[in-house]
């Protein structure tokens, strides 16, 4: 879809997680986005998806108890509403429709990256224990499975704000 021009390249952050947003201590409001070395042309769904992977999960990225891992649809809804409204009508209908798939894709991609790092000796992601990246991989793939099961609800949420 990107190659045939239906999904435009946008300026994307490519590391959209909460710790890359400076928050004002007094107001609790976002001040600015940081860690700009990853900014480049990309797909909106990927930025949205990475933030959902991080922000709508019910568990930490390295949770060992996989029964705690799921995508919180309320958090997905709140974020989707803010994201779509915050884009001020700039997104195409197809870009908006692809947002849930972006969440699944980016979660899967990160799971594979954690597994690759584990298999290659844990040289890229900092680890705190033996098997840490393998735990991260399992958590991400469990989250992917849950997102796939919830895809109809995620699509319905997105349609509300389209």
Where are the predicted features?
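All-alpha amphipathic helical-bundle segments outside canonical DNA-binding/catalytic cores
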Residues: 91-103
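Active-site capping/gating regions of soluble enzymes
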Residues: 16-18, 23, 75, 96-99
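Active-site activation/catalytic loop segments of kinase-like enzymes and analogous catalytic loops
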Residues: 45-89, 105-124
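Catalytic activation segment of kinase domains across protein kinase-like and atypical kinase folds
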Residues: 5, 19-60
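ATP/Mg2+ or Mg2+-diphosphate-binding catalytic cores
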Residues: 109-162
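Short, well-structured alpha-helical interface segments that form or flank functional binding sites
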Residues: 28-31, 43, 74-78, 94
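ATP-dependent phospho-/nucleotidyl transfer catalytic cores
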Residues: 1-13, 18-32, 126-134, 145, ...
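Secondary-structure capping and boundary motifs in well-ordered enzyme cores
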Residues: 8, 13, 40, 103-108, ...
